[in-house]
């Protein structure tokens, strides 16, 4: 079911055929980003908590109104960053703002990691990023061409056999409290894996 916020009410728009228990609440399609206040978002989150096991709010880049709205009703945060100096610096600032808003349960996702560049010394490792930001790691997503392909095809990557798909699934499991080992990102896809993927399409 797709939900949309109209004034202070929620209305059903359409249903996701593949995931019957997934409900989506899209952001307002308006140029006025102040149309919804943090107080309204907190009220909405509190109401939804009575009906759903998990409520995930996707936060836009930056620290403006969209960020304030997203964290207003949050009790924990997943900070996603790439292993680049500028991105890690931005993530550090975000973590500081989360702490200032009394959101102390934060975890880190390192996105688009390339193990070959890490080995060459041209990219920070996930351990480097964790040391700098000082929060616990919950996921590492490799820089995987399957992400681009799935996005262009409009298909979910979670549950697929590729490394990125496995990484997404493992993050979900860790969020739910499972103890899941981290993937070996040095593994390269072999001929038979590629052949198997072709026949699955």
Language-model regions, residue ranges each:
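Conserved catalytic-core segment of NTP-binding enzymes
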Residues: 43, 47-50, 54, 59-149
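C-terminal boundary of histidine-terminating zinc-finger modules
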Residues: 151-165
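Generic secondary-structure signature for well-ordered alpha-helical cores
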Residues: 10, 54, 134, 143, ...
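Flexible beta-alpha connector loops of hexameric P-loop NTPases
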Residues: 29-37, 85-86
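Short, conserved glycine- and acidic-residue-centered signature motifs
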Residues: 37, 41, 87, 164
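Short, basic/glycine-rich phosphate-binding loops at helix/coil junctions
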Residues: 20-29
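Single conserved hydrophobic/aromatic residue that forms the stacking wall/gate
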Residues: 1-7, 11-12
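P-loop NTP-binding site
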Residues: 136, 166, 170-201
């Amino acid at each position: 079911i797709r939900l949309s916020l109209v004034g202070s009410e929620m209305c059903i728009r359409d249903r996701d055929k593949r995931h019957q228990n997934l409900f989506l609440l899209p952001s307002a399609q308006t140029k006025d980003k102040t149309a919804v206040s943090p107080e309204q978002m907190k009220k909405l989150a509190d109401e939804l908590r009575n009906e759903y096991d998990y409520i995930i709010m996707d936060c836009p880049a930056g620290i403006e109104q969209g960020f304030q709205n997203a964290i207003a009703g949050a009790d924990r945060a997943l900070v996603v960053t790439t292993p680049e100096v500028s991105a890690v610096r931005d993530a550090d600032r975000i973590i500081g703002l989360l702490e200032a808003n009394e959101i102390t349960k934060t975890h880190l996702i390192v996105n688009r990691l390339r193990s070959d560049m890490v080995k060459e010394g041209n990219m920070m490792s996930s351990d480097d990023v964790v040391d700098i930001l000082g929060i616990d790691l919950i996921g590492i997503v490799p820089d995987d061409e399957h992400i681009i392909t799935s996005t262009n095809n409009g298909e979910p990557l979670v549950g697929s056999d590729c490394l990125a798909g496995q990484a997404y699934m493992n993050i979900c499991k860790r969020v739910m409290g499972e103890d899941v080992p981290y993937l070996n990102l040095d593994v390269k896809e072999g001929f038979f894996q590629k052949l198997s993927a072709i026949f699955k399409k």
